[in-house]
Amino acid sequence: MSEIIRQVMISGRVQGVGYRAWLAHTAEAMGLHGWVRNRRDGSVEAVLAGSEPIVSEMIARCQRGPSAARVEAVVAEIAQPDVLNLRQPGERFSILSTL
């Protein structure tokens, strides 16, 4: 099965509620790799890579998020493999610094 890569932007009340940690833990548990970070505009950005059904399921879960989050929108776009280079060396899924 071929791998797909999606760049996902999540907006709403998604900072200060454990969203990045939840996303990283959930994605890793599902066998995905990539990264997640806060953005200064209050949104969360993630890159998810893996098989199409698993990436699609994770994007659907992003619409709910952790219990304290209030997600308003999730936008996913096709991403190029080079975006995965932002991960920390040796990690399957990284939590990056705010951009």
UniProtKB/Swiss-Prot annotation:
Hydrolase is among the record's keywords: yes
The UniProt record lists the keyword Membrane: no
Residues of the active site: R20, N38
GO molecular function, one term: acylphosphatase activity
Enzyme class label: hydrolase
Enzyme Commission (EC) number: 3.6.1.7
Gene3D superfamilies, alphabetized: 3.30.70.100
Catalytic activity line of the entry: an acyl phosphate + H2O = a carboxylate + phosphate + H(+)
Domain Acylphosphatase-like, first and last residues per copy: 5-97
Matches recorded under InterPro entries: Acylphosphatase, Acylphosphatase-like_dom, Acylphosphatase-like_dom_sf, Acylphosphatase_CS
NCBIfam families referenced in this protein's UniProt entry, alphabetically: PRK14421.1
Family: Belongs to the acylphosphatase family.
Protein's recorded name: Acylphosphatase
Protein source organism: Rhodopseudomonas palustris (strain ATCC BAA-98 / CGA009)
